[in-house]
Amino acid sequence: MEAHNASAPFNFTLPPNFGKRPTDLALSVILVFMLFFIMLSLGCTMEFSKIKAHLWKPKGLAIALVAQYGIMPLTAFVLGKVFRLKNIEALAILVCGCSPGGNLSNVFSLAMKGDMNLSIVMTTCSTFCALGMMPLLLYIYSRGIYDGDLKDKVPYKGIVISLVLVLIPCTIGIVLKSKRPQYMRYVIKGGMIIILLCSVAVTVLSAINVGKSIMFAMTPLLIATSSLMPFIGFLLGYVLSALFCLNGRCRRTVSMETGCQNVQLCSTILNVAFPPEVIGPLFFFPLLYMIFQLGEGLLLIAIFWCYEKFKTPKDKTKMIYTAATTEETIPGALGNGTYKGEDCSPCTA
């Protein structure tokens, strides 16, 4: 198993017992624990009726899946060609581009006032579709770059575990909201505190585990690629959803889902498919990508919040006037904020 025209093996070794140290185990446990509470808290913001609406009228979901498995793999492939990366570097980027959406997108969608029901449905469907789409896309795009059978390295077990870690806590949160809504705010507040503490622990343990090794992956071309990939995903995800006339909440949701990748699955494939002397420091490319997608996502959230802050005071009077006028002139207005005969499709602009 080797890439065509691959350069000489990297003079690189992973830290001793990498992936099997106590700190690695602690990091894995904390990540699962944190993900559970993230999904539980997000589940408390969802409703079965709205999830059903997205599934029965899957316009937003279909556009999101096209963006996820159309834009990101093609972006990774094109960036590899534009920057004339070595074949092994192009492969590492391609694996990241072919991965499904990550759970970070759900947090970003919440911060961007997106449609959380669509966000969770998208993450679930994207991960489920990865069972077939990842091997197909890796087979299509890796031809001519890699001699081995990369599609057989897809971590199906990891994909199923990702599905379970999304579906179970979200379902608990949804049931809690419908059956015991009085406890919902305590769960969300407690969850946020636990997530914050876990985030600090994850940051510290990641720094201990990786150390200076990630510096080997920080070449100018890889930095450029890992910074452009999430940005292009965020941008084109928004543009595509705007072209199909999704509303603002759904556009922001599709944008976040497209730009955020499941870097854990990407790391698993690189670890399984290539020995350290072949993949070298590129083993840490998914972590580099995660740093940039986190930074760019937070920047977009900050820009959105600033926009909301400056926009709201100016539009508030207009909104109040419009609401009052509507109630007076349209007797068919309903108490839930919709109107008789109005299209209630969750993503209609």
Swiss-Prot record:
Bilayer topology annotation: Multi-pass membrane protein
Effect of Q264 to A/W: Disrupts interaction with HBV myristoylated pre-S1 peptide, reduces bile acid transport and reduces HBV infection
GO MF, any single term: virus receptor activity
Outcome of swapping S41L: Decreased function in taurocholate transport
Glycosylation sites: N5, N11
Effect of I88T: In FHCA2; decreased function in taurocholate transport
Extracellular side: 1-22, 84-86, 143-156, 218-219, 274-280
Effect of mutating I232T: Slightly decreased function in taurocholate transport
Associated pathology: Hypercholanemia, familial, 2: An autosomal recessive inborn error of metabolism characterized by persistently increased plasma levels of conjugated bile salts apparent from infancy, fat malabsorption and impaired absorption of fat-soluble vitamins, including D and K. Most patients are asymptomatic. Some neonates may have transient jaundice or transiently elevated liver enzymes.
InterPro entries: BilAc:Na_symport/Acr3 (IPR002657), Bilac:Na_transpt (IPR004710), Na+/solute_symporter_sf (IPR038770)
Subunit details: (Microbial infection) Interacts with the myristoylated pre-S1 domain of hepatitis B virus large envelope protein; myristoylation is essential for this interaction.
Catalysed reaction, written as an equation: taurocholate(out) + 2 Na(+)(out) = taurocholate(in) + 2 Na(+)(in); cholate(out) + 2 Na(+)(out) = cholate(in) + 2 Na(+)(in); estrone 3-sulfate(out) + 2 Na(+)(out) = estrone 3-sulfate(in) + 2 Na(+)(in); taurochenodeoxycholate(out) + 2 Na(+)(out) = taurochenodeoxycholate(in) + 2 Na(+)(in)
Effect of R252H: In FHCA2; loss of function in taurocholate transport; loss of localization to the cell membrane due to intracellular retention
GO biological process, one term: response to nutrient levels
Result for mutant: L138P: Loss of function in taurocholate transport
Effect upon mutating K314E: Decreased transport of taurocholate and cholate; decreased transport of estron sulfate; does not affect localization to the cell membrane
Protein's UniProt keywords contain Cytoplasm: no
Protein name per Swiss-Prot or TrEMBL: Hepatic sodium/bile acid cotransporter
Pfam hit, one: SBF
Documented effect of changing M39T: Decreased function in taurocholate transport
Record-stated family: Belongs to the bile acid:sodium symporter (BASS) (TC 2.A.28) family.
Effect of S267F: In FHCA2; protective factor against hepatitis B virus infection and chronic hepatitis; unable to transport taurocholate and cholate; does not affect uptake of estrone sulfate; does not affect localization to the cell membrane; disrupts interaction with HBV myristoylated pre-S1 peptide
Lineage, highest ranks first: Eukaryota, Metazoa, Chordata, Craniata, Vertebrata
